Amino acid sequence: MAAAALGQIWARKFLSVPWLLCGPRRYASSSFKAADLQLEMTQKPHKKPGPGEPLVFGKTFTDHMLMVEWSDKGWGQPRIQPFQNLTLHPASSSLHYSLQLFEGMKAFKGKDQQVRLFRPWLNMDRMLRSAMRLCLPSFDKLELLECIRRLIEVDKDWVPDAAGTSLYVRPVLIGNEPSLGVSQPTRALLFVILCPVGTYFPGGSVTPVSLLADPAFIRAWVGGVGNYKLGGNYGPTVLVQQEALKQGCEQVLWLYGPDHQLTEVGTMNIFVYWTHEDGVLELVTPPLNGVILPGVVRQSLLDLAQTWGEFRVVERTITTKQLLQALEEGRVREVFGSGTACQVCPVHRILYKDRNLHIPTMENGPELILRFQKELKEIQYGIRAHEWMFPV
């Protein structure tokens, strides 16, 4: 108990300002500038996917990428260049010690042919927080966003316009120290690549998934780095995902603590739409307590629901005991995950301690999920103007 309490105090006081633990040169105000952006167009453009051609997530890349190098002397000039392999020293710290972070966001092409990014400011905020946590160099968020906008502008013909498609944007920042010592890197590399994508899960946006909830596996913990988007958080989940598939489930429901708190679904945030034990209809999602990744779509669903004002919206711990009781009493309406890749994903079954728990999400419409999906689609594809969208 004492250790847990100390961990929570440490998380509150120090994880919010991790730059205090790193050398000051990484957090100087200097940054690369979009005005200095250099452009080298490809001489060998790739064949673009044709109309109706399946867009498997993360398999197809556009013609160009953004690259910015950093050393302890500061940032170099940003450049847009032909998509190409990286050249890394075999001792690069990103390869050995996971000094790497990434982001994921989407650009959408509306019927007016305007390309728009969805709430990219939140991604820039989160990326900078992740950089500070790893003692990687700071940067100006608006300058990076402008460089990304220019990159998308160069490859705008790659943005698909079919229903459910988008351009996935993957910014990455890695330590590139050519040394086997575990230390703050004096070299780093920031790059951005683009992928035209379709729906994340086979079957479309309303295909429900089943979850393996095994308390033997833990994704993140208080005082750790589960609330940052770091590459090292994802590799260890592959084995558990394979175990879920072996047991007939599509995804993993990550549990935490002796009371088996619901935290995340695969790489998604989790929501429960139910009648609380006090009789009030509510939408609940776990709080940002250091274990949960602050998802952009998560925040968007909370914002939308609060705007509607039709039911209680709350960030609160959810335990498996509470979920089991609510299922037995018929109070659960919908359970779903949210994330940039999948947007909103229904859950229809949870395998927990050899028990198959039926979740009545699909029997209930899923009314709330479909409403969220409709609202997001109208905003993202420019069907109605919204301040969340950033024009390219």
From Swiss-Prot:
Give the EC number: 2.6.1.42
Q: Give any Gene Ontology cellular component.
A: mitochondrion
Residues with the N6-(pyridoxal phosphate)lysine modification: K229
Q: Which reaction does it catalyse?
A: L-leucine + 2-oxoglutarate = 4-methyl-2-oxopentanoate + L-glutamate; L-isoleucine + 2-oxoglutarate = (S)-3-methyl-2-oxopentanoate + L-glutamate; L-valine + 2-oxoglutarate = 3-methyl-2-oxobutanoate + L-glutamate
What is one GO biological process annotated to this record? L-leucine biosynthetic process
- Gene3D superfamilies for the chain: 3.30.470.10, D-amino Acid Aminotransferase, subunit A, domain 2
Disulfide linkages recorded for this protein, renumbered to the chain, are: none
Binding positions for substrate per the UniProt entry: Y168
In this chain, where does the modification N6-acetyllysine occur?
A: K321
Q: Where is the transit peptide?
A: 1-27
Report the locations given in the UniProt record: Mitochondrion
Assembly, in brief, is:
Homodimer.
Q: Which PANTHER family match?
A: BRANCHED-CHAIN-AMINO-ACID AMINOTRANSFERASE, MITOCHONDRIAL, SUBGROUP IIII AMINOTRANSFERASE
* Family classification: Belongs to the class-IV pyridoxal-phosphate-dependent aminotransferase family.
General function of this protein: Catalyzes the first reaction in the catabolism of the essential branched chain amino acids leucine, isoleucine, and valine. May also function as a transporter of branched chain alpha-keto acids.
Protein's name in the database: Branched-chain-amino-acid aminotransferase, mitochondrial
| Lineage of the organism | Eukaryota, Metazoa, Chordata, Craniata, Vertebrata
Primary gene name: BCAT2
